[in-house]
């Protein structure tokens, strides 16, 4: 299906945030930053929050309500606004229905959705499938790439199939609680234990002795029944963004680096949730201090990873730079957009400011439309 015809004037963008995942608060913070930076001369914004139990709510979209304040994380509640529904009918593409005690009120249709959702039930293909069914264009990757990019098992399977450099890992499916001797010897110590379909370092543990493994697996399983145990990769943490333009052209951003080890007592080098969002305990170098040939290789690998997963619109690819070269760690199909997030910073370093970056994403989504492609 092609994109809807646009009436003269501004494009109506629904920014959807919150959601049912453990990354609810970070999604809210990302949305606040996006709401603050969407060009009001080009875009009319509709802010839609999703509560932790899955209710859709039309909010006032004030960015100041979506910030971390004195360590308190923001959240969407049913009191945040009017409950909404999105009819899954292409003949009503973008139509919103405000729910109430009566029959409901039909609201003006949106032209495009910006799903600023991190983690399961948002970044994993679920809302993308809903929007495809409803015939509403949306920012970011489609159903398959979103699902594959969210699941660390399948991300690495697809990257490996394309011959891209990845680290070693073992998947613990439901009912499997530990590693066997061969797996322990293969991975070595330390290892990182993660929910297979999670982000923002939530539920992640660094294990330095095998007797710590059961507790780490139990923590990860609070967020996902499928758990990943990754071999530690010794190297610098680098990131690179990929952006698709309306004409289908792909570009890679300036390369950035995250430095944690030795910063404010974080000698373990573990970039966890608190370090990312609460303690301001990481140093971000944009551009990264690497040789030009290394930066070029990172940028090329980022585009190859983007293509291997089948991404669209945007993604951030995370690397370790080892003595033997770059290793791809993860791909994020909807990276963070907070004030400290690397994705907008890396593009700004290359000359694309935040409002221009957001406009390019929306324009690409509209040009792409929905349906098989």
Curated annotation (Swiss-Prot):
It is an enzyme of class 6 (ligase). This is D-alanine--D-alanine ligase. Pfam families: Dala_Dala_lig_C (PF07478), Dala_Dala_lig_N (PF01820). Binds 2 magnesium or manganese ions per subunit. It comes from the Bacteria. One of its GO terms (cellular component) is cytosol. It is found in: Cytoplasm. It catalyses: 2 D-alanine + ATP = D-alanyl-D-alanine + ADP + phosphate + H(+). ATP binds at residues 184-239. The keyword Cell membrane does not apply. The gene is ddl. Cell wall formation. Pathway: Cell wall biogenesis; peptidoglycan biosynthesis. The keyword Magnesium applies. GO terms for biological process: cell wall organization; peptidoglycan biosynthetic process; regulation of cell shape. Keywords: ATP-binding, Cell shape, Cell wall biogenesis/degradation, Cytoplasm, Ligase, Magnesium, Manganese, Metal-binding, Nucleotide-binding, Peptidoglycan synthesis.
């Amino acid at each position: 299906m092609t994109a809807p015809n646009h009436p003269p004037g501004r494009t109506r963008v629904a920014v959807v945030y919150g959601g049912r995942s453990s990354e609810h608060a970070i999604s809210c913070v990302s949305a606040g930053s996006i709401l603050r930076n969407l060009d009001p001369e080009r875009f009319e914004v509709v802010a839609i929050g999703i509560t932790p139990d899955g209710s859709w709510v039309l909010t006032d979209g004030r960015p100041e309500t979506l910030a971390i304040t004195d360590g308190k994380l923001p959240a969407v509640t049913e009191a945040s606004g009017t409950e909404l529904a999105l009819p899954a009918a292409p003949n009503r593409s973008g139509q919103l229905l405000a729910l109430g005690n009566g029959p409901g009120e039909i609201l003006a249709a949106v032209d495009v959705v910006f799903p600023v959702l991190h983690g399961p039930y948002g970044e994993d293909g679920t809302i993308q499938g809903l929007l495809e069914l409803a015939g509403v264009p949306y920012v970011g990757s489609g159903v398959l790439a979103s699902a594959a990019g969210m699941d660390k098992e399948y991300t690495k399977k697809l990257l490996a199939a394309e011959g891209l450099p990845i680290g070693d890992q073992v998947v613990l499916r439901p009912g499997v609680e530990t590693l066997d001797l061969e797996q322990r010897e293969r991975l070595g110590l330390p290892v990182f234990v993660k929910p297979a379909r999670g982000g923002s370092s939530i539920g992640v543990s660094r294990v330095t002795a095998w007797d710590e493994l059961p507790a780490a697996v139990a923590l990860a399983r609070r967020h996902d029944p499928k758990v990943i145990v990754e071999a530690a990769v010794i190297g610098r943490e680098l990131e690179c963004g990929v952006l698709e333009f309306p004409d289908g052209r792909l570009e890679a951003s300036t390369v950035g680096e995250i430095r944690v080890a030795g910063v404010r007592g974080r000698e373990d080098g573990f970039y966890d949730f608190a370090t990312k969002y609460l303690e301001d305990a990481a140093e971000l170098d944009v551009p990264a201090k690497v040789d030009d040939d290394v930066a070029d290789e990172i940028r090329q690998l980022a585009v190859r990873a983007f293509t291997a997963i089948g991404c669209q619109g945007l993604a951030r690819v995370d690397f370790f730079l080892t003595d033997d070269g770059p290793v791809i760690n993860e791909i994020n199909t909807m990276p963070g957009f907070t004030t400290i997030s690397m994705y907008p910073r890396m593009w700004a370093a290359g000359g694309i400011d935040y409002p221009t970056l957001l406009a390019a994403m929306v324009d690409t989504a509209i040009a792409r439309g929905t349906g098989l492609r």
